[in-house]
C-alpha cells in the first residue's frame, strides 16, 4: 500500500480523548488498565491511523503565514466538496450556494430542528441510536420517539416501515433524523429502502435530517446512496450533513458541512445557526478539508476501506470461533461492530458492566452499548492497525470471554 496503516502511533499527551481519558469520565470512558497492560482504544469513534499527508501539508502551509484574521471561505473549499461528492457519490447539480459550513454534524441537527419544530415536539430516530443524537436532541428540548431496527433472517438490520408509519402518525411527528450509513449498526442502506422511507416521510410531511458523516467508510460490495438522490421530493425536504472529520480522522479540527437544495429550508436553517455565531468556520479547518479532498485523499480512503475490511473480517471471524454466545450483524460500512452479548451474559451469570470492566482492566477499551439502546451490547472500534486488533482479540479471549 502507498499509505501507512500499520504503524502504532503514540497519542498520549497529544489531545486524545481515546487514550488520555481512561478512568476520567465515569460512565463513558473505560477504567484505567491494570499495570502491565497498555491501552488499546476501541471506543471513541476516531481512528488510530495517521491522516492523509496532504491535510498536514495544507495546514502547515497556511499556518506559516503569521496572520489569522477574519476571512471568507475560499472558492476552492466549495470546489473540492462539489468534486468529492460527484466522484464519490455520483452527486449531480451541486452548487456552492447549496453548501454551508456546520460546526459539527450535531449542531446541524439541532439547528434544523429549531427551524422546524417546537421544544417538546417528537422527533423520530431509529434505534439502536447514536448516543450523540440522544444527548443533543433531548438537551435541545425535543422528545425522541424510537423506531427499532429489526434483524432479518440473514442477520441484516432492516427498517420497520410499518412501525415508522405508526409512530409518525400516533405522535404527530414532522421531523426525522436518519443515519446513513447507520451508526452503530454499520448498515449501508439500499436505494429501495431509502426510497420507501422517504415516501413515508413525504406522506407525513417530515423534514428529514440525514447524517451521512460515515458515507466515505463503505466496505467492498456496498455503495452509499445519498438520501437526497432518490427522488426530487427527497432532494427538497432533506438536510444532508457531511464532514471530512470521520473519513480523515479530523474530529479535533471540527468542520462539517450541510447540503440543502431547497432555498426556503436552507434559509430557515441558516437563520437559526447564524443567530448565535457558533457556526463560524475555522480557517485551519477549511484548509484541512481542502487538503483532504485532494487526489491523494481519494487514494487514501480507498486504501483505508481495504484495511478496515480486513480488520472487520479478522475480528468477526475471531468472535465466531472464540466467543460463543456473542452475536453481531457484520457491518457494511463504518468501522464499528455492535456486539450483542446477551446470550453470553446469561450463560455465564455476568452482566454487560462486568464485560466492560474486565476488558478495560486488560487494556481493551471498548464502549458500553446501552446508551446506544443496545441493552447488552458493546460497540467496538476497529480503526486501528491489524496488529492491535489481534492483540485485543487475544486479551479478550484469555482474560475476559474465556477466562479460567
Predicted regions and their residues:
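PLP-dependent enzyme catalytic core of the Aspartate aminotransferase-like
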Residues: 347-350, 357-404
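Conserved PLP-binding catalytic core of the aspartate aminotransferase-like
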Residues: 308-309, 322-361, 378
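N-terminal small-domain helix-loop-helix segment of the aminotransferase-like
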Residues: 2-104, 111, 295, 403-404
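A short helix->loop->beta-strand "cap" motif at the edges of active sites that frequently abuts
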Residues: 142, 203-206, 235-236
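Conserved core of the PLP fold type I
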Residues: 68-199, 216-217, 221-229, 233, ...
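PLP-dependent aminotransferase class I/II
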Residues: 237-321, 327-331
Amino acid at each position: 500500500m502507498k499509505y501507512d496503516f500499520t504503524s502504532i502511533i503514540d497519542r498520549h499527551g497529544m489531545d486524545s480523548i481515546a487514550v488520555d481519558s481512561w478512568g476520567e469520565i465515569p460512565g463513558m470512558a473505560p477504567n484505567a488498565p491494570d499495570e502491565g497492560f497498555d491501552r488499546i482504544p476501541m471506543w471513541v469513534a476516531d481512528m488510530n491511523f495517521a491522516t492523509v499527508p496532504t491535510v498536514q501539508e495544507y495546514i502547515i502551509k497556511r499556518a506559516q503565514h503569521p496572520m489569522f484574521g477574519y476571512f471568507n471561505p475560499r472558492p476552492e473549499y466549495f470546489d473540492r466538496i462539489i468534486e468529492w461528492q460527484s466522484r464519490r457519490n455520483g452527486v449531480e447539480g451541486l452548487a456552492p450556494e447549496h453548501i454551508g459550513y456546520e460546526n459539527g454534524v450535531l449542531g446541524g441537527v439541532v439547528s434544523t430542528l429549531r427551524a422546524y419544530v417546537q421544544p417538546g415536539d417528537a422527533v423520530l430516530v431509529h434505534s439502536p441510536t447514536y448516543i450523540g443524537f440522544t444527548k443533543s436532541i433531548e438537551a435541545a428540548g425535543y422528545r425522541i420517539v424510537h423506531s427499532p431496527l429489526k434483524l432479518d433472517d440473514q442477520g441484516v438490520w432492516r427498517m420497520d416501515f410499518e412501525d415508522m408509519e405508526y409512530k409518525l402518525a400516533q405522535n404527530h411527528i414532522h421531523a426525522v433524523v436518519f443515519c446513513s450509513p447507520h451508526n452503530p449498526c454499520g448498515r449501508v442502506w439500499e436505494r429501495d429502502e431509502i426510497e420507501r422511507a422517504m415516501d413515508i416521510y413525504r406522506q407525513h410531511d417530515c423534514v428529514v435530517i440525514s447524517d451521512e458523516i460515515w458515507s466515505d467508510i463503505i466496505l467492498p460490495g456496498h455503495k452509499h446512496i445519498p438520501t437526497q438522490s432518490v427522488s426530487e421530493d427527497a432532494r427538497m425536504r432533506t438536510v444532508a450533513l457531511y464532514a471530512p472529520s470521520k473519513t480523515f480522522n479530523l474530529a479535533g479540527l471540527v468542520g462539517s458541512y450541510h447540503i440543502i437544495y431547497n432555498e426556503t429550508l436552507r434559509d430557515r436553517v441558516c437563520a437559526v445557526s447564524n443567530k448565535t455565531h457558533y457556526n463560524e468556520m475555522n480557517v485551519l479547518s477549511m484548509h484541512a478539508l481542502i487538503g483532504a479532498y485532494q487526489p491523494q485523499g481519494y487514494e487514501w480512503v480507498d486504501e483505508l476501506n481495504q484495511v478496515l475490511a480486513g480488520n472487520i473480517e479478522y475480528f468477526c471471524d475471531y468472535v465466531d470461533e472464540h466467543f460463543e454466545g456473542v452475536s453481531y450483524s457484520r457491518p457494511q460500512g463504518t468501522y464499528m461492530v455492535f456486539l450483542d452479548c446477551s446470550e453470553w451474559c446469561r450463560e455465564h451469570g455476568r452482566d454487560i458492566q462486568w464485560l466492560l470492566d474486565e476488558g478495560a482492566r486488560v487494556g481493551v477499551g471498548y464502549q458500553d452499548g446501552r446508551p446506544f439502546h443496545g441493552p447488552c451490547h458493546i460497540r467496538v472500534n476497529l480503526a486501528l492497525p491489524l496488529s492491535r486488533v489481534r492483540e485485543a482479540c487475544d486479551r479478550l479471549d484469555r482474560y475476559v470471554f474465556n477466562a479460567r
